[in-house]
Each structure stands twice: as structure tokens, then as C-alpha cells.
């Protein structure tokens, strides 16, 4: 009974590990390289779908964007120009 529980626990942990690795590493890297290859040739529908996938598979992106403030002088200058 205990060995069956340990075996099932390892199987579940392994499945979570594989799914997490796919979700956090493999699919985001694929999307990144796909966007680099297709950036200048995408149509509107493909771009819309890729943006949706980016927000789905980059879970930290929403969190980081809400707190990110550029610290470079060129970024502040561009923001100041855009606000006028």
C-alpha cells in the first residue's frame, strides 16, 4: 500500500513537472523564436493570436509590466515626448 502511494505520488509529481516545464519553458521559447522569424511578415489575425498566446504562456508578463518603469534616460525622454 505504501509503495503504491509513493509510486502514484512520484507519477503525479513527474506529470506536474513535465507540464510545468512545457508551460514555463518550451512553449514560451517556441513563441519567442516564432515571433522573431515571422515579425515582419505576420498578418493581423496571426499577430492577434500570437499576442493572446504570449499573455497565456508568459504568466509573469502581466505582473512585471505593471511594476516596470524604465530607468534609462532615453526611455524617460521618449515617454516625455509621447505625453506632449
From Swiss-Prot:
KW Metal-binding (keyword) present: no
Protein name per the record: NAD(P)H-quinone oxidoreductase subunit L
Compartments it resides in: Cellular thylakoid membrane
A GO CC term attached to the entry: plasma membrane-derived thylakoid membrane
InterPro entries in alphabetical order: NADH-quinone_OxRdatse_su_L
Annotated membrane topology: Multi-pass membrane protein
UniProt keywords, alphabetically: Membrane, NAD, NADP, Plastoquinone, Quinone, Thylakoid, Translocase, Transmembrane, Transmembrane helix, Transport
Superkingdom field: Bacteria
Enzyme Commission number: 7.1.1.-
Purpose: NDH-1 shuttles electrons from an unknown electron donor, via FMN and iron-sulfur (Fe-S) centers, to quinones in the respiratory and/or the photosynthetic chain. The immediate electron acceptor for the enzyme in this species is believed to be plastoquinone. Couples the redox reaction to proton translocation, and thus conserves the redox energy in a proton gradient. Cyanobacterial NDH-1 also plays a role in inorganic carbon-concentration.
Residue ranges of the TM segments: 10-30, 48-68
Catalytic activity: a plastoquinone + NADH + (n+1) H(+)(in) = a plastoquinol + NAD(+) + n H(+)(out); a plastoquinone + NADPH + (n+1) H(+)(in) = a plastoquinol + NADP(+) + n H(+)(out)
Subunit structure: NDH-1 can be composed of about 15 different subunits; different subcomplexes with different compositions have been identified which probably have different functions.
Molecular function GO terms recorded: oxidoreductase activity, acting on NAD(P)H, quinone or similar compound as acceptor; quinone binding
Enzyme's top EC category: translocase
Main location: membrane
Family: Belongs to the complex I NdhL subunit family.
Gene name tied to this protein: ndhL
